[in-house]
């Protein structure tokens, strides 16, 4: 094993000793020796199966057969979640064949960040993770269930569902993906059209046609953003079946994998032969494997918050130092858009998860001795699923990458440093997705141009006010200020400035997700401006140094001068009402800092 990996793992274990012990005691107390519904009074139970078919009622009355909860995030708004419409039918059929019963225990909201990007609704995006966790918990709280299947793919949905699953950590749980849409317009062409539109060289209809050719069918968007990073990370964590993340929707193999996940969760219950509750399965080693997956693939920066919150739900304490120290030894081994031109379908064709797991296990950069939904040992995830005469089977995946432009070997990685860098200095701590930023653009020292809203940046760009070397500061975008929206609308104009050979960087307490692109961006700055961060004292013209190689984020202003300045606190009332934002005020005020997971839930 890599010594650094062991050091980080051991310090997480030590740091989490008390909280993890308390968590395990809690789930042990919740465990029962029989099916969970046996604890209900007759009236409770009758309500619970009132709408079931007669055969299912008989099974539930018997107290012998498993009842599996289905927590679904189906809606028609998310292309990745639309396929879930028919999953309950597939699941119930597979459960009946396994002498078990399934009920849709609840649905959770699922927001498409692609739809809300740059809109008021984006200010609910991060908060929706907490609502998803609580909504799933409401469904499971009926206490009718012996295991659960979680149907979710996209940005906040998988982290929220994981937090809920771990709150019911005494139950086994399997996550069931839907898979990516087929590849559409090449990513390089999509970016070209966006930048032309930002420069006023193509009209809105040309932009719309380009976007519609990129996002065109049911399934996950194919770029390597938060949704596909979710799938990568949870497969490395053993939370869904080997090789199941990136199989297309509406294919015989996808349906076979859904049925197999269903059968597997019945084996993992107290009535089965492989009892493995999710709260015991997800331990410190599993969390480290998830971080390694993120770093090795240059995944979404959102996971520097999501993984923290997910781990806390299991009583495990991680921080950005853990990400940083692992990033020093985990190489970047995948090049997917925005880190390169390839999409997630190219990744799958190049060998996918099995190749990466095999390479990282050989390098001693993953813990093999972990429990997964497929059984003990992460080496199971070097297998790939296939249909053998119409029946699902697993075989060894590719021994090495089938396309070295998409998946590199450990010996010849795209970079010897993981795709995420933690920055620190007097401005606080921040995260930079270095995997998408050319080395020559990772270091900048330039005057600040300060904005209080992302919507003010485009007019400044159009007026030529940014045609110079500068550090664009967009502040009061943190969790407590306005819910920490993603700021993707900034990328096309800032990308144009880079192409004009200006030295440009972005510094913000907001988010950018996995599609942060080529602009060097110090994001998730914590403490945020609204909550006492020095970012609130930055003025136009102040020199800021951003160094993605050494991990520096420094405001080069004399300490005495900074002490004399008053923080600038703008009127944020416009972010408090409209589009339902007033309903989230209590949650927003309780959100922790980005490094603490940006969560309002106390675990």
Question: Residues of each region from the PLM?
Answer:
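Catalytic or ion-coupling anion/metal-binding cores of large enzyme and transporter domains
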Residues: 1-66, 72-76, 80, 89-108, ...
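A short, small-residue-rich loop immediately preceding and capping a beta-strand
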Residues: 139-161, 174-176
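Acidic/charged coordination and interface sites in well-structured regions
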Residues: 86
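Contiguous domain-boundary segments centered on the initiation and propagation of an alpha-helix
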Residues: 129-136, 143-148, 458-466, 473
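N-terminal small/polar loop signature for handling phosphorylated ligands or for N-terminal nucleophile
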Residues: 105-143
